[in-house]
């Protein structure tokens, strides 16, 4: 949520221009991000689907399954995608994609995700293990 205009000069006065700008930037709307569900689609499948729908995106260097959508993308446009309806792509923040990558789940690993709601990291761990984690 953007900060009210009158608040920005107060931040500058209190914290200085550099930190104030970082605070203001942190309050701006974030772009929508999603990941390919590797059990149902490749990143190339997702890219082709987004291209066909005219949805702009950027790829993420550190995770090939991740996509950052163009700022003008509406969620309803994503919800209407065939791959979304099939569960082949998942709306998930980039920061939420990091823990499963750090864990590196392997086939046969038993995982108890005690914070699973709505389950994005859990489904990502399942995909990273090739559908063979428990």
Say what each PLM segment does:
Residues 1-134:
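S-adenosylmethionine
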């Amino acid at each position: 949520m953007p900060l009210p205009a009158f608040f920005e000069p107060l931040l500058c006065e209190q914290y200085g221009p550099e930190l104030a700008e970082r605070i203001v930037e942190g309050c701006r709307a974030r772009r929508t991000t999603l990941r390919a569900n590797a059990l149902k689609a490749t990143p190339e499948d997702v890219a082709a689907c987004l291209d066909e729908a005219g949805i702009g995106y950027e790829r993420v260097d550190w995770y090939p399954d991740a996509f950052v959508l163009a700022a003008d993308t509406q969620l309803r446009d994503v919800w209407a995608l065939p791959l979304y309806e099939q569960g082949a792509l998942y709306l998930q923040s980039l920061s939420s994609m990091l823990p499963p990558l750090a864990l590196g789940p392997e086939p046969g690993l038993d995982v108890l995700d005690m914070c699973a709601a709505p389950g994005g990291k859990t489904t990502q761990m399942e995909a990273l293990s090739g559908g063979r984690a428990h």
